[in-house]
Amino acid sequence: MEDNLTRIQNIVGKQLGIEPSKVTSGADFGKELGADSLDQVELVMAIEEEFEMEIEDQAAGQIATVQDALDYIEGRWKK
């Protein structure tokens, strides 16, 4: 089974047409990976689907990097 970071890297790679191995944990979706605002919404939706959870709108707006997404997911699972 893939770890959470790998799962997120695969989602980002698929959504943005980037090789997942080139998606680092600190990569900024917009600045470094070229995602526009629609891409970022689609990334959040894909992450929600993959991890079977809902990301609150306020939190979704604060997820700008792979690490932000990972921290949110792992933080939700600890609750």
Task: Identify the meaning behind each predicted range.
Residues 1-21, 74-79:
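Thiotemplate assembly-line natural product biosynthesis machinery
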Residues 6, 21, 41, 66-67:
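Residues in well-ordered alpha-helical elements
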Residues 9, 26, 44:
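Generic structural marker for isolated residues within well-ordered, non-membrane alpha-helices
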Residues 15-34, 50-62:
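Phosphopantetheine carrier-protein modules
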Residues 61-62, 67-78:
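C-terminal structural segments of small proteins and small subunits
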Residues 34-44, 64-66:
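Amphipathic alpha-helical interaction surfaces in cytosolic regulatory modules
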